[in-house]
Amino acid sequence: MTTTLQQRENANVWERFCSWVTSTDNRIYVGWFGVLMIPTLLTATICYIIAFVAAPPVDIDGIREPVAGSLMFGNNIISGAVVPSSNAIGLHFYPIWEAASLDEWLYNGGPYQLVIFHFLIGIFTYMGREWELSYRLGMRPWICVAYSAPVAAATAVFLIYPIGQGSFSDGMPLGISGTFNFMIVFQAEHNILMHPFHMLGVAGVFGGSLFSAMHGSLVTSSLVRETTETESQNYGYKFGQEEETYNIVAAHGYFGRLIFQYASFNNSRSLHFFLGAWPVVGIWFTALGVSTMAFNLNGFNFNQSIIDSSGRVINTWADIINRANLGMEVMHERNAHNFPLDLAAVEAPSIKG
């Protein structure tokens, strides 16, 4: 009898926990994805803050030349970063228990792996949680689809690119200057500016900004007047009101005359789908581009494409970019290479004595 009561009580505790996790009445929805999201994002955040403030220098290139990234070792907010794990570790999984000591783990950049793996699991589960809450509320599932764009971009630079290059030391550093260094080296080694998928991403981000500004300014300029001149326009809207707060016909008429009729949406639903889809598709393409360049399928190379009748090269902007790329390449990891990879890959000339 006692066992039966105990089992029933345990079942009730589990049922209460399940109903709490999946309840949409909570101030912040938890969800089953949230059960994994909360501890992983907390772990990533706490480790990142500690490492950014106090981590000792990391031997990122695997050549016994540690690079300092934390505030306590001479950096500021701009130059500071969590430095990627050592090239000596490569793609090996490097948790704390794989190191001989905590000092060794820190020296080889263990915190970087801890942060990015927990962060990636955290953002994957955040995306799942968006779907889960939409499902519970009977909404359509496109919020998590839109969020998949930045998730794909983060996965590309923190996971796919290091896998393709053979080492987590090639992942993006977790800091401001480190991010710019990553971008410059990426251009030097992969010519990303000449990759069509990056171009589509630029069109997505800049176009999305343009369309967002256009939409916001058009709506704000065609609000239905509900207030006096001395009151804020914002008081003219009551949360949950049934009436439209702006005149879409006026906005359509204005923009249709400013450009031409068919450049202006006359359907609010298709308009907002377009506003969501444009930047998302662009960022998808950029993430796909980075993921292919990870395996050295690089941007277009038009170096020395134009030659005169005598066979002399007529330099174009492509050759200027190539010179810049070589300059950036010889400057990065200065003590790890004697030559940029492009020059080192050329077969040495034979020497006849």
Curated annotation (Swiss-Prot):
Pheophytin a binds at Y126. The record marks Y161 as: Tyrosine radical intermediate. It catalyses: 2 a plastoquinone + 4 hnu + 2 H2O = 2 a plastoquinol + O2. Its EC number is 1.10.3.9. The D1/D2 heterodimer binds P680, chlorophylls that are the primary electron donor of PSII, and subsequent electron acceptors. It shares a non-heme iron and each subunit binds pheophytin, quinone, additional chlorophylls, carotenoids and lipids. D1 provides most of the ligands for the Mn4-Ca-O5 cluster of the oxygen-evolving complex (OEC). There is also a Cl(-1) ion associated with D1 and D2, which is required for oxygen evolution. The PSII complex binds additional chlorophylls, carotenoids and specific lipids. It is a multi-pass membrane protein. A quinone binds at H215, S264, F265. Its main location: membrane. GO terms for biological process: photosynthetic electron transport in photosystem II; response to herbicide. The record marks H190 as: Stabilizes free radical intermediate. It comes from the Bacteria. Fe cation binds at H215, H272. Keywords: Calcium, Chlorophyll, Chromophore, Electron transport, Herbicide resistance, Iron, Magnesium, Manganese, Membrane, Metal-binding, Oxidoreductase, Photosynthesis, Photosystem II, Thylakoid, Transmembrane, Transmembrane helix, Transport. Cyanobacteria usually contain more than 2 copies of the psbA gene. 2 of the reaction center chlorophylls (ChlD1 and ChlD2) are entirely coordinated by water. Belongs to the reaction center PufL/M/PsbA/D family. Photosystem II (PSII) is a light-driven water:plastoquinone oxidoreductase that uses light energy to abstract electrons from H(2)O, generating O(2) and a proton gradient subsequently used for ATP formation. It consists of a core antenna complex that captures photons, and an electron transfer chain that converts photonic excitation into a charge separation. The D1/D2 (PsbA/PsbD) reaction center heterodimer binds P680, the primary electron donor of PSII as well as several subsequent electron acceptors. This is Photosystem II protein D1 2. It comes from Trichodesmium erythraeum (strain IMS101). The gene is psbA3.
